[in-house]
């Protein structure tokens, strides 16, 4: 829902799992949100980060590590990270 100024005013905006595109419900207490920091060519953090959300379903199956690796390899090419 938007107000007259075009700002989002919803009380709850559900997140989606980055790996499966499933909606992460409010009762999914096993879900996590992970920020991965970007580094420069010297290996120093440059203030940027990428956020990934993983549902409890992916974590319960034991696929979180491979899903996060796959997502980061895809995103790394987009942000030109080494």
UniProtKB/Swiss-Prot annotation:
GO terms for cellular component: cytosolic small ribosomal subunit. GO terms for molecular function: structural constituent of ribosome. The keyword Membrane does not apply. The keyword Ribosomal protein applies. This is Small ribosomal subunit protein eS21. One of its GO terms (biological process) is endonucleolytic cleavage in ITS1 to separate SSU-rRNA from 5.8S rRNA and LSU-rRNA from tricistronic rRNA transcript (SSU-rRNA, 5.8S rRNA, LSU-rRNA). It comes from Oryza sativa subsp. japonica. Belongs to the eukaryotic ribosomal protein eS21 family. PROSITE patterns: RIBOSOMAL_S21E. Pfam families: Ribosomal_S21e (PF01249). InterPro entries: Ribosomal_eS21, Ribosomal_eS21_CS, Ribosomal_eS21_sf. Keywords: Ribonucleoprotein, Ribosomal protein.
């Amino acid at each position: 829902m938007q107000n007259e100024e075009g700002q989002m005013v919803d009380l709850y905006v559900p997140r989606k799992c980055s790996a499966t595109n499933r909606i992460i419900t409010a009762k999914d207490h096993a879900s996590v949100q992970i920020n991965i920091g970007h580094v420069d060519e010297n290996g120093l953090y440059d203030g940027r980060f990428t956020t990934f959300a993983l549902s409890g379903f992916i974590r319960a199956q034991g696929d979180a590590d491979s899903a996060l690796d796959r997502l980061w390899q895809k995103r790394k090419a987009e942000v030109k990270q080494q």
